[in-house]
């Protein structure tokens, strides 16, 4: 019993979690869970996650597990030796049957022939039904769209195909047709040895087939069951598509294909290299050839067999589904040519023989020439040449397609370089493979991963079979084809955006006239769409047409819009001016080929840039201004490129010229090319200052006083009288305002206009009087001008002095109006400063050195340093060192402003420690300001 329990435990470990039977062709996932190959294949159709742990996986992550199959084989041998059957495997033949299957190859051949015969019987029935279906292809009724896989085909291996089935021409065609519904152009041949193909390479899972042929019987049975059904449209779970990036060489194309060398293993297209346990992707030489190419190589096949195979295809996929598949094209790459093929197939169906196909194509080509001749002869030659060039531009692929076209119809005449028929163009593009393929799904239901495989199958196709199987059911899908074509043309050919609509409209009009002339109203929509496709193809390929094609200039407007480098706008407005183009400073035309070195700017944007000027026609500093403006955002729209700043230097607003023109409050100087923003509208522009100087010059009397009132207006006369009445004002008198209100500034401006004194906005050593604002207590705020005026010994007066001068119309003494106190309580600072300057005493901080440490705001620290230097002190850039001087002359200044890093106590202690080590004194920033405001050095605490 102990042995039985161990055997039972081993059997549980060797069970598949899906089918609960012993592993059959075991494979493992990236999560190390093991399943049967067939089980995980079926599971992946519904959900690409591990059935045990639900971890997502891709098809490339599935790897064979031969060691598990070896364990299953050992387990079965142990069961046979013990005589106990604990678990039932997926197929459990008797030991005697196993030995017979391994030893006797003749029995296997016989069973293969029997199965082959049964398939032939079923195929003949489908053949008969297909013939009736072909006759009644236009019968009324709903069109049933059966799903079909459009990706790289995943097939069940046909384990039991005999070698004789591929040697006979008739059996080869019919055998390739039977799995057609599921395998899509796959022909498989296995030799007598189950592990070797014709070249002697090991087949996939060869280690499994040597173990037990009895287990493969279940796979054969399952494959037989799947042959009669259409598989579910399964998306591809792998991005390994070797054939999308590689193509067979010319030698491989010219060689006669051997279907015995081509096979797919299950759904993964694995192959096994000799003496290698790794499962690798299929190489290029092992790709499955389309059955149409195989039909080309077997020249002994009669045409009757080809017709019967077409009928069989119509039974499996239905003729209407084939037409639906043709309507949406083989792929996004070849959809234009496939639409043209749909029209040609209609003409072919109305005539019925392949011999008339080329004649119809020639007629179609002549009709196209007649339509285009209504517009111009040059357009006809261009379109036909572009069709030919488009076919030649495909390189090796195009050469191979032309070769396959010639093989399929050797009696067809070859068109000239400018007379390439539509039929030859379509054959070269490889649409003919779709006629024998299964029915396609609806365009909206197609998986995105199906397109690459459609491209592959479209390139490996046959001409005659395509032209014979096409039907005229494309009218219902015309609108959908136009949408898909237009969207693809826009996305993939964005470099050719102009001219397509104009040419297409003309061709549509010509196509309608030609159709009405031939009384073929049923094909109007299809012919129009064919013309659109051909015109789009010629427009796209005109760049590669070389000198063989005649190019025609489009009638539409192709003016390219340029974007201004400053305002980022491409439209020319009255505010921006016209668009100009400069190459290395020189003006050029719009179509000048200078690359990225050509600068496109509006005329006004360039003229109003601050540092840009013109030397004759050459523009100077344009690139420098562009570099500067790329870092400046517009105060109006927020975009970069705002080169135009406010005339007020202290204002930080910058604008695009076009944005500033939209603001009515902005003031402009068209002479100096400067602008004032709405916030500084009260400031005078250079042109206004010049006008005021001119007015002052005109006010100088050149005639007697009695004639003056007759020459000027009453208001000007009053001002002239006021100016004459102000006596005692020196021309060197310069006023500066400090903290005044708007009303007080207005009084100052009026006084300056009447008296002729100068007003300075910023502090300067030439300032003689500082007019400051005071509160109800007579104290003024500490400003930079106030502190500098104390150190320089200037007058610091209230606004009352200005009012007194205007009232008395003469110079009034300043002493009664001098400010004596600031808001911090320091008194007599302005008076002491004036006395120090009058007596020519040394400055306040003469002989003292200051080291500023701690966390100061940059602006505050800069103002503090300016005040110390103006007071005669010295700023140390490095930490002070100890000196032998008896009297300490170095002061370490720390900040008293609130800071997030350190408290006031910590900053004070740090300054005192540094001062002690350097034999210096520590002082706060408020001590420095108080000393300057009082014009005397205060005692350090």
Curated annotation (Swiss-Prot):
A zinc finger (RING-type) spans 16-54. InterPro entries: BRCA1-associated, BRCT_dom, BRCT_dom_sf, EPHD, Znf_RING, Znf_RING/FYVE/PHD, Znf_RING_CS. One of its GO terms (cellular component) is nucleus. It is found in: Nucleus. Keywords: DNA damage, DNA repair, Metal-binding, Nucleus, Repeat, Zinc, Zinc-finger. Residues 96-115, 125-136, 175-196, 242-255, 428-453, 477-487, 512-528 have a biased composition (Basic and acidic residues). One of its GO terms (biological process) is DNA recombination. Induction: By gamma rays treatment. Residues 87-282, 303-528 are annotated as: Disordered. Residues 724-819, 840-941 form the BRCT domain. GO terms for molecular function: ubiquitin-protein transferase activity; zinc ion binding. The keyword Ribonucleoprotein does not apply. Disruption phenotype: Enhanced sensitivity to mitomycin C. A zinc finger (C2HC pre-PHD-type) spans 561-612. The keyword DNA damage applies. Expressed ubiquitously with highest levels in flower buds. Mostly expressed in flowers and siliques, and, to a lower extent, in roots, rosette leaves, inflorescence and young cauline leaves. Residues 157-173, 216-236, 329-357, 376-391, 489-498 have a biased composition (Polar residues). A zinc finger (PHD-type) spans 632-681. A motif (Nuclear localization signal 2) lies at residues 444-451. A motif (Nuclear localization signal 1) lies at residues 298-305. Forms heterodimer with BARD1/ROW1. Plays a role in DNA repair and in cell-cycle control. Required for the repair of DNA double-strand breaks (DSBs), both natural and induced by genotoxic stress, by homologous recombination (HR). This is Protein BREAST CANCER SUSCEPTIBILITY 1 homolog. The lineage of its organism: Eukaryota, Viridiplantae, Streptophyta, Embryophyta, Tracheophyta.
């Amino acid at each position: 019993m102990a042995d039985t329990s161990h055997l039972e435990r081993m059997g549980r470990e060797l069970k598949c979690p899906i089918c609960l039977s012993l592993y059959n062709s075991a494979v493992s996932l990236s999560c190390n869970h093991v399943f049967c190959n067939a089980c995980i294949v079926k599971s992946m159709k519904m959900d690409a996650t591990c059935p045990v742990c639900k971890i997502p996986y891709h098809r490339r992550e599935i790897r064979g597990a031969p060691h598990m199959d070896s364990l299953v084989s050992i387990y079965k041998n142990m069961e046979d030796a013990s005589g106990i059957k604990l678990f039932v495997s997926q197929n459990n033949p008797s030991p005697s049957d196993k030995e017979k299957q391994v030893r006797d190859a003749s029995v296997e051949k016989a069973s293969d022939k029997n199965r082959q015969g049964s398939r032939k019987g079923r195929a003949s029935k489908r053949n008969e039904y297909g013939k009736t279906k072909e006759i009644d292809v236009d019968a009324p009724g709903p069109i049933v769209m059966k799903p079909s896989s459009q990706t790289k085909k995943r097939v069940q291996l046909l384990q039991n195909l005999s070698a004789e089935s591929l040697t006979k021409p008739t059996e080869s065609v019919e055998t390739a047709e039977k799995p057609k519904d599921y395998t899509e152009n796959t022909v498989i041949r296995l030799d007598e040895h189950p592990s070797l193909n014709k070249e002697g390479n090991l087949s996939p899972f060869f280690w499994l087939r040597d173990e037990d042929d009895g287990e493969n019987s279940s796979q054969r049975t399952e494959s037989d069951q799947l042959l009669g059904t259409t598989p579910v449209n399964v998306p591809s779970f792998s991005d390994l598509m070797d054939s999308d990036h590689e193509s067979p060489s010319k030698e491989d194309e010219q060689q006669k294909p051997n279907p015995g060398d081509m096979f797919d293993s299950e759904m993964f297209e694995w192959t096994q290299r000799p003496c290698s346990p790794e499962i690798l992707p299929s190489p290029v030489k092992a790709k499955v050839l389309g059955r149409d190419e195989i039909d080309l190589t077997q020249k002994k096949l009669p045409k009757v067999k080809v017709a019967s195979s077409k009928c069989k295809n119509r039974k499996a996929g239905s003729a209407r589904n084939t037409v639906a598949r043709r309507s949406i094209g083989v792929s996004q790459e070849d959809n234009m040519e496939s639409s043209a093929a749909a029209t040609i197939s209609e003409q072919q169906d109305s005539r019925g023989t392949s011999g008339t196909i080329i004649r119809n194509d020639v007629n179609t080509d002549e009709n196209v020439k007649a339509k285009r001749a209504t517009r111009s002869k040059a357009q006809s030659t261009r379109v036909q040449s572009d069709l030919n060039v488009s076919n030649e531009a495909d390189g090796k692929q195009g050469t191979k397609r032309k070769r396959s076209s010639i093989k399929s119809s050797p009696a067809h005449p070859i068109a000239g370089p400018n007379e390439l028929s539509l039929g030859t163009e379509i054959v070269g593009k490889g649409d003919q493979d779709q006629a024998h393929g299964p029915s396609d799904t609806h365009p909206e239901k197609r998986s995105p991963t199906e397109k690459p495989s459609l491209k592959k199958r479209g390139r490996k196709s046959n001409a005659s079979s395509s032209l014979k199987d096409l039907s005229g059911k494309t009218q219902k899908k015309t609108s959908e084809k136009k949408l898909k074509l237009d969207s693809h043309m826009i996305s993939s050919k964005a470099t050719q955006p102009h001219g397509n609509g104009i040419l297409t409209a003309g061709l549509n009009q010509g196509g309608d006239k030609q159709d009405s002339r031939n009384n073929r109203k049923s094909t109007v929509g299809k012919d129009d769409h064919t013309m659109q496709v051909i015109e789009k193809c010629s427009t796209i390929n005109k760049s590669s047409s070389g000198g063989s094609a005649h190019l025609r200039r489009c009638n539409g407007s192709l003016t390219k819009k340029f974007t201004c480098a400053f305002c980022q706008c491409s439209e020319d407005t009255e505010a921006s001016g016209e668009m100009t183009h400069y190459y290395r400073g020189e003006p050029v035309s719009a179509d000048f080929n200078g690359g990225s070195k050509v600068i496109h700017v509006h005329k006004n944007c360039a003229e109003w840039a601050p540092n840009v000027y013109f030397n004759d026609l050459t523009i100077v500093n344009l690139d420098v201004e562009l570099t500067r403006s790329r870092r400046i955002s517009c105060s109006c729209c927020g975009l970069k490129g705002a080169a135009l700043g406010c005339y007020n230097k202290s204002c930080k607003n910058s604008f695009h010229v076009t944005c500033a023109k939209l603001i009515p409050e902005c003031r402009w100087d068209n002479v100096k090319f400067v602008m004032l923003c709405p916030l500084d509208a009260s400031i005078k522009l250079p042109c206004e200052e010049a006008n005021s100087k001119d007015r002052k010059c005109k006010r100088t009397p050149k005639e007697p006083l009695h004639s003056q009132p007759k020459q000027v207006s009453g208001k000007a006369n009053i001002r002239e009288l006021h100016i004459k009445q102000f006596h005692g004002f020196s021309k060197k008198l310069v006023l500066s305002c400090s903290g005044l209100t708007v009303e007080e500034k207005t009084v100052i401006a009026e006084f300056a206009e009447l008296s002729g004194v100068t007003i300075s906005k910023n502090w300067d050593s030439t300032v003689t009087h500082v007019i400051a604002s005071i509160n109800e207590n007579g104290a003024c705020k500490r400003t930079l001008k106030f502190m500098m005026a104390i150190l320089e010994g200037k007058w610091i007066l209230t606004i009352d002095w200005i009012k007194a001068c205007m009232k008395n119309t003469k110079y009034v003494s300043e002493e009664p109006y001098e400010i004596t106190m600031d808001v911090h309580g320091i008194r007599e600072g302005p008076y002491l400063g004036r006395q120090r300057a009058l007596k020519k005493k040394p400055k306040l901080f003469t002989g003292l050195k200051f080291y500023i440490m701690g966390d100061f705001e940059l602006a505050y620290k800069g103002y503090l340093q300016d005040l110390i230097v103006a007071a005669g002190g010295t700023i140390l850039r490095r930490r002070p060192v100890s000196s032998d001087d008896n009297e300490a002359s170095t002061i370490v200044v720390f900040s008293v402003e609130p800071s997030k890093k350190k408290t006031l106590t910590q900053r004070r202690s740090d300054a005192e420690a540094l001062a002690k080590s350097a034999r210096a004194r520590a002082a706060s920033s408020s001590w420095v300001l108080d000393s300057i405001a009082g014009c005397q050095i205060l005692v350090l605490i």
